[in-house]
């Protein structure tokens, strides 16, 4: 857990499916905004790197994406993303202005057990990037969204209806096919949850 940033997703108790959806939406928006601004990829968005703080259930957040102002609910949980050690981003205009971590230097990262979603996610990232870690490949963000949805379904216990569970399972499946967090933001599970307005 991070002192000022809240408790990590691994250790916090979610109260309901609305909190789970709001958490996923906030992570998706944050990644999509960073993709647009800096061609950002987190590349290590496991449960310990998603911090949650309790806030007012009616609190909303705002973000600017593609020239549009987005407003979206927290449902009582504010998200902070931490640990950018493995991340990739553009810091300028030239190829030499890319900050990234060469994950090939840590082969153990790819040797975790098959069927373990976090280990599988590292391997899926390697396949998506073709092992060229400086290259911008926002699909890695979508792969971590799939991972987070998987963890919500398999590792976290909170009340949800059959319909809410089906929505989460559907998002998990669709996230594997998305090319970016920006694309995931338009998922059926999120459409109608966030609002937009031209600035």
Locations of regions flagged by a protein language model:
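Structural signal for hydrophobic/aromatic residues that build the beta-strand cores
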Residues: 2, 9, 27, 31-34, ...
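C-terminal or late-domain output modules
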Residues: 30, 49, 54-69, 75, ...
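Catalytic activation segment of kinase domains across protein kinase-like and atypical kinase folds
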Residues: 41, 46-124, 128-131
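Helical subdomain adjoining the active site within ATP-dependent kinase catalytic cores
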Residues: 114-199
């Amino acid at each position: 857990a991070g002192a000022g940033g809240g408790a990590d997703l691994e250790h916090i108790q979610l109260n309901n499916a609305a909190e789970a959806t709001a958490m996923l939406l906030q992570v998706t928006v944050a990644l999509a905004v960073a993709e647009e601004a800096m061609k950002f990829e987190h590349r290590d968005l496991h449960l310990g790197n998603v911090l949650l703080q309790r806030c007012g259930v009616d609190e909303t957040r705002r973000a600017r994406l593609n020239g549009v102002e987005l407003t979206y609910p927290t449902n009582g949980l504010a998200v902070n993303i931490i640990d950018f050690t493995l991340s990739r981003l553009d810091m300028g205009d030239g190829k030499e202005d890319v900050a990234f971590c060469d994950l090939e230097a840590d082969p153990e990262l790819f040797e975790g057990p098959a069927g373990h979603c976090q280990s599988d996610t590292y391997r899926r990232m390697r396949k998506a990037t073709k092992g060229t870690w400086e290259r911008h490949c926002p699909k890695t963000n979508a792969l971590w969204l799939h991972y987070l949805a998987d963890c919500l379904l398999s590792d976290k216990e909170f009340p949800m209806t059959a319909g809410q569970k089906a929505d989460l399972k559907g998002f998990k499946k669709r996230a594997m096919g998305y090319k970016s967090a920006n694309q995931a933001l338009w998922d059926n599970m999120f459409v109608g949850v966030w609002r937009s307005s031209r600035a």
